[in-house]
Amino acid sequence: MPYGDVTAIPTKDVEAVIVSKGEGVLAGVGVVKILFDLAEIVVMESKKDGEPIKPGDVVMRLRGKSDSILATERLAINILMRMSGIATATAKMVERARRVNPKVVVAATRKTTPGFRIFEKMAVEIGGGDAHRFSLSDCLMLKDNHIAVAGSLERAMKVKRSFTKKLEVEVGSVGDAIKAAEFGADIIMLDNFTPEMVAEAVEELRRRGLREKVIIEVSGSVTPENVAEFAAMDVDVISSGYITHSAPALDFSLRVLQ
């Protein structure tokens, strides 16, 4: 068959295990089980999404035709590697952020792999984060280009609103953060702010009696190394593209048992 394993020997019934080669948070088990079901491979036992794993852990035990197992091996492992890497990176950022701000939410962005967004967002949630938006239709969100097209922040914020969707406004300065709050934004995204700028914006909103009226989100160049610094600034949400575009994959291998 096209894209089958051209080197496979005649098929026979075999058992196999998928083994972790790294330490982190397991994700993708539910997705891979669907793949194996389609290939008529029986999952005899498995760990669950969200479980901690370490090198040498058997995460799945399989039984099926050897040609089916070999044909699905790489796709299954790639899914586990990618999703577990994202879940692990998310869990690390959540732990570091909540160490200094127990209520802060760590969220993903739309900086995802084409065609794989739903699984990457799923992995973020397994790691303890928030999926944030899946598409432009999920939230009224005014970004810099929307404001540029409208001509000004004031004009952009006249967008038709609905009680079913919050309005989020991306700002690049403390002054615009104040304007957005005064114009009725529900969520203010402080984009590419330094921690010092975040602290200034939060304090100015508080001084004007606006802090409790808005959700403050920080975004832009947030990594595991600096997430705690931003979390300490009394923000509500920290969104990071890192967890989907730069999270290291967690390695796995499949072994056919003799």
From Swiss-Prot:
Indicate which residues the UniProt annotation says bind substrate: 74, 109-111, 133, 143, 170, 191, 219-221, 240-242
A single GO cellular-component term from the record reads: cytoplasm
A GO BP entry is: NAD biosynthetic process
**Assigned EC number:** 2.4.2.19
Task: Give the reactions, separated by semicolons, that this protein catalyses.
Answer: nicotinate beta-D-ribonucleotide + CO2 + diphosphate = quinolinate + 5-phospho-alpha-D-ribose 1-diphosphate + 2 H(+)
Keywords linked to the UniProt accession: Glycosyltransferase, Pyridine nucleotide biosynthesis, Transferase
Is Protease one of the keywords?
no
Record's family?
A: Belongs to the NadC/ModD family.
Q: What is this protein called?
A: Probable nicotinate-nucleotide pyrophosphorylase [carboxylating]
Its ancestry begins with:
Archaea, Methanobacteriati, Methanobacteriota, Archaeoglobi, Archaeoglobales
* Gene this chain is encoded by: nadC
